[in-house]
Amino acid sequence: MSKIETSGPVVQVGDARFANHLPLTLIAGPCQLEGRQHALEIAAALKEMAAGLGVGLVFKTSFDKANRTSGSAARGIGLDGALPVFAEIRETLGLPVLTDVHAAEQCARAAEAVDVLQIPAFLCRQTDLLLAAAATGRAVNIKKGQFLAPWDMKHVAAKVTEAGNPNVIVTERGASFGYNTLVSDMRSLPIMAQVTQGAPVVFDATHSVQQPGGQGASSGGQREFVAVLARAAVAVGVAGVFIETHPDPDRAPSDGPNMVALRDMPALLEELLAFDRLAKRRTA
């Protein structure tokens, strides 16, 4: 199992297609939805970049960071404030949108304005949440918990598919390794694909370099290793890569230490696409 099998299901999200044997797809955007104009500007910049490189794009952002280290940390604008922004990004820019949900009752409302519901890593085994997300018919991206073995995702993904929704994506975002540290085991990528019957596998390159609680009242991160881990994962042959980005990461309200500066995204993605072509034996 040196790399992911070159066949399997395809999850269509707007114009983007996720499959382990197809060209790499990008999920990107700011960690937190900070406001309408901020989100639109980032989404427009990412759209232009993706179009220039010929890569599928799903815009991501979070309306609520419900698991912040400190109760006093900024959480976001909330679902009510986010829904019009999500809808505007879809309608004016033509981009599919992904956001995370934290409670079963959020799923149907979020699904009105987004294309992908994301299950946070800490909540990946919450059956009611998974079933509610599945019931919307939207694609469901499940982050593998930092506490799970990759083969445990078999049963997690099955909760969605057995509920009648085949549009499942599974994402690796690191495993807990001692205190305030995550490590990435690249073996997990083909293992997750195998145990989920070929579900598209995504590598979360920015949360994988997070240092949970590493700054006391907030999480730290090592963004200098984002490209290192992303290259390794894409070389395995994944369906997509997840990268949080911001115009000024050091001033972002959450996850700044592990986000990639927006200006650095084109060069990083161009490099990753070269690795993707090599992994999937395609020509430029």
Curated annotation (Swiss-Prot):
Its EC number is 2.5.1.55. GO terms for cellular component: cytoplasm. One of its GO terms (biological process) is keto-3-deoxy-D-manno-octulosonic acid biosynthetic process. It catalyses: D-arabinose 5-phosphate + phosphoenolpyruvate + H2O = 3-deoxy-alpha-D-manno-2-octulosonate-8-phosphate + phosphate. It is found in: Cytoplasm. One of its GO terms (molecular function) is 3-deoxy-8-phosphooctulonate synthase activity. Pathway: Carbohydrate biosynthesis; 3-deoxy-D-manno-octulosonate biosynthesis; 3-deoxy-D-manno-octulosonate from D-ribulose 5-phosphate: step 2/3; Bacterial outer membrane biogenesis; lipopolysaccharide biosynthesis. It is an enzyme of class 2 (transferase). Its main location: cytoplasm. The keyword Methyltransferase does not apply. Belongs to the KdsA family. HAMAP family: KDO8P_synth (MF_00056). This is 2-dehydro-3-deoxyphosphooctonate aldolase. It comes from Methylobacterium radiotolerans (strain ATCC 27329 / DSM 1819 / JCM 2831 / NBRC 15690 / NCIMB 10815 / 0-1).
